[in-house]
Amino acid sequence: MIVRPVTSADLPALIELARSTGTGLTTLPANEQRLQHRVSWAEKAFRGEAERGDADYLFVLEDDAGKVVGISAIAGAVGLREPWYNYRVGLTVSASQELNIHREIPTLFLANDLTGNSELCSLFLHADHRSGLNGKLLSRARFLFIAEFRHLFGDKLIAEMRGMSDEEGRSPFWESLGRHFFKMEFSQADYLTGVGNKAFIAELMPKFPLYTCFLSEEARGVIGRVHPNTEPALAMLKAEGFSYQGYVDIFDAGPAIEAETDKIRAIAESQNLVLAVGTPGDDAEPYLIHNRKREDCRITAAPARAAAGTLVVDPLTAKRLRLSAGASVRAVPLSAQKRG
């Protein structure tokens, strides 16, 4: 498996992936025109022709037969072209000494606080390929790209995680809150956002703080929680240094997690090594390896052995990277458990 930049030839495969995501993955709508537009912008970003606020680095996971089975992306900066909304989960305190009453009420504040940060987004792996190292490669490959081209990204990375919804796409949070203001199904609002029609959010979203005690018990219970299918991705990002700081999605209340870019494990511990081609040996461990290129970027995960400034890999790994012995690579142990 390799992770590489998307190309226009991948559009049919992207449409098929988008159709299988279900609701809740806003940035990957099953809309051919929107996906074609996004691929075009991604190609510009990899060529260095996009401003940071427009840069959308879209990657695909491809097997050795050339089949695209997954997708992930990095947005250079959010909210610089149109407002970026989250709810900040805060606290409102009311008290009366005379009545001996003290109440602390969790409150949702509409916020644009995460504007300007880079974002990890659009992570999706086909169900038939959710095994082995594939998920870790697809998600963590982005960190090596950021480490190699650090100047393209902000000092903080965020990731909006998919919130709770049932098999029919029903979101408890949306049913208790959003539906009253938008008068549409959660799936429709999710789709409109994904195809770039975001003006309705600013026009219809309530601007005043919202006391969560007015929401249903079910809705309150999903604030800051992820969809079960998203739990592995959340655990992976937490292992890299991400944490929840009280921001949630305005539609499904899924958590927006964040980390300082330079403190993310795979970025901070990655290093440039000289590629050696041979037999890694019994003491090899899984490494994430990047060929240090931008437009012709290739990233893979494979057993490797680092020693004395070199990284020993087998011939197939070198072939996947499109490199020969003596080339420079950026590499890091694949899993956070290997740190140190």
From Swiss-Prot:
Protein name per the record: Arginine N-succinyltransferase subunit beta
Enzyme class: transferase
Reaction it catalyzes: succinyl-CoA + L-arginine = N(2)-succinyl-L-arginine + CoA + H(+)
EC number(s) stated in the UniProt entry for this protein: 2.3.1.109
UniProt similarity note: Belongs to the succinylarginine dihydrolase family.
Gene that produces this protein: aruG
Pfam families attached to this UniProt entry: AstA
One GO term of the biological process aspect: arginine catabolic process
InterPro entries noted in UniProt: Acyl_CoA_acyltransferase (IPR016181), Arg_succinylTrfase_AstA/AruG (IPR007041), Arginine_N-succinylTrfase (IPR017650)
A GO molecular function held by the record: N-succinylarginine dihydrolase activity
Disulfide-linked positions: none
Record has Acyltransferase as a keyword: yes
Keywords attached to this entry: Acyltransferase, Arginine metabolism, Transferase
Pathway per the UniProt entry: Amino-acid degradation; L-arginine degradation via AST pathway; L-glutamate and succinate from L-arginine: step 1/5
Subunit structure: Heterotetramer of two alpha and two beta subunits.
